[in-house]
Amino acid sequence: MGKIIGIDLGTTNSCVSVMEGGEPKVIANVEGNRTTPSVVAFADNDERLVGMIAKRQAVTNPERTVYAAKRLIGRKFTDAEVQRSQEVSPFDIVEGISGSVAIQVEGHKYRPAEISAMVLGKMKQTAEEYLGEEVTEAVVTVPAYFNDSQRQATKDAGKIAGLDVKRIINEPTAASLAYGLDKKVEEKIAVFDLGGGTFDVSVLEIGDGVFEVKSTNGDTFLGGEDFDMRIVHWLADEFKREQGIDLRSDKMALQRLKEEAEKAKMELSTTVETDINLPFITADASGPKHLNIKLSRSKFETLVEDLVERTVGPCKTALKDAGLSASQIDEVILVGGMSRMPMVQKKVVEIFGKEPHKGVNPDEVVAIGAAIQGGVLQGDVKDVLLLDVTPLSLGIETLGGVTTKLIEKNTTVPTKKSQVFSTAADNQPAVSIHVLQGEREMAEGNKTIGRFELADIPTAPRGVPQIEVTFDLDANGILNVSAKDMGTGKEQSIKITASSGLTDEEIDRMTKDAELHADEDKKRKELVEARNSADGLIHSTEKTLKDLGDKVDAETKENVEKEIANVKTALEGDDVEAIKAAIEALTAASHKLAELMYQQASQETPGDGDAGAAGAKKKDDDDVVDADYEEVK
């Protein structure tokens, strides 16, 4: 049985971990980094680039470089958050099938789940290269405040990437696993998770292997991306004021601003001022323009003050829902790159009245927790019980547009709840079940996550038919709903699918597409390796010919030069087999050169060397010179 890996699928960066010898290990990627940018780019030759290689070329290829796809996953195009992303994104965010979100690159529409699948595929590949075996199962983390649609879309992304997602686990819960695995003393902890795109806070009771989530809250559209954009807009406004040019209208300039903003933000966590220097950012009739400006930590804090303040409400709500005061929290665990910002840490102290615990790596702790959960599922990690909760209430729309909740928020999962409803009109032949998620009293204020119909209800006065609606919420936080006519026994059910609208057929198509590109990547790698081998062989063979000079007979030299020319011709094309065949032919032709080299080496070594030494000795005997030595005392 293969390993179950743990993947933190982040907005900005992703991380993969695995249990080895009872300990979680974060796996470094091919570049040697322990986190990988969640960036996907499409090159000119239809090549897909994922990770740091994609991020590096973003400035020259902004319209075909996709980042922060996690912020779009499981959403509808009309969502306010999607519209906000569309305004500042250098790549095209468009409407997809059934009102879903799509990312358009060169006429092709990609779903956010498809982009996320490419990132998951990269993490899968990183794990496989380290483990030396195929990986097919994973635990993938999501923000605790992700709704049903977003969770389902994340699971779909795993499937497209060729992974059976054994469990979707909340990021703060994963962090608590990593923090408290060996803790025997009971503690009440708060996990404050401010990442690249989302904010979560969870309150847990942990101790002796039991991790019980008491409450969770958050904001799925608050994170480092928003902090970056505040700097981007400030830089653009300052440049416009000085030069009269709005850099936001130039996608390449916008991408350069974004990269520099992210760098400045990170630097300001450890320094009080940073220089932002972007030469040749644009040009007009008078010539090239340069951007050179200083940004102080205090100015940055002024720009993002309201963003930091937005973390307060969810923290207070989470404490209230858990029935605890801030003073009853024993430890506050910081998770996510943005938690390094001094202003954020100061706000945490204000909220909880204590210094946060800094003993975990905020970039890796979630992936480590996911690997531990993988170990639990695999049976490698014993005596760990994880009791997570649903972040939002679930219910159905009833008469008058009211939301009737069947499962309240912060209910421990998995859970199953049933309630009996009836018809609203006489002789009503069918009932429409409108499934909702959210905390508002009226249906229109909550998120629709599914609709289905129970038909063929026998004619009867209103209020007489008995319709039992059952909500079954699994450990991943994914919902199944059924409705049953108690009179006839007729039943209708629905597995809630993401608002991304991915059907099984679409997932299969995307999976095949991902596999096809994996094969293409493999072939491309094989071609590169063959080219490198050919170049190396040409270089060494030409050097040998030159070194041997006249010692090579004309026939051998002509034969070798002919094969070198054949390899060079093969290198002009992309046929791997042709290059390999040419390499073999040149290697065979070079054997004669190797023999000559060996003969030459034989003539110059030990036997001749000894004779030379003897001769030298004789000469020494003929010309002996006595040296005068003075003894130094």
From Swiss-Prot:
Q: Which domain of life is it from?
A: Bacteria
Q: Does the keyword Transport apply?
A: no
Phosphothreonine modification sites? Answer: T198
Q: Where is the region Disordered? A: 599-633
Q: Does the keyword ATP-binding apply?
A: yes
Bias category Acidic residues: which stretches? 622-633
InterPro entries tied to this protein: ATPase_NBD, Chaperone_DnaK, Heat_shock_70_CS, HSP70_C_sf, HSP70_peptide-bd_sf, Hsp_70_fam
Describe what upregulates or represses it.
By stress conditions e.g. heat shock.
Keywords per UniProt: ATP-binding, Chaperone, Nucleotide-binding, Phosphoprotein, Stress response
Q: Per UniProt, what is one GO molecular function of this protein?
A: ATP-dependent protein folding chaperone
Q: What does this protein do?
A: Acts as a chaperone.
Q: Which PANTHER family match?
A: HEAT SHOCK PROTEIN 70KDA
What protein family is recorded?
A: Belongs to the heat shock protein 70 family.
Q: What is this protein called?
A: Chaperone protein DnaK
Species the sequence originates in: Desulfotalea psychrophila (strain LSv54 / DSM 12343)
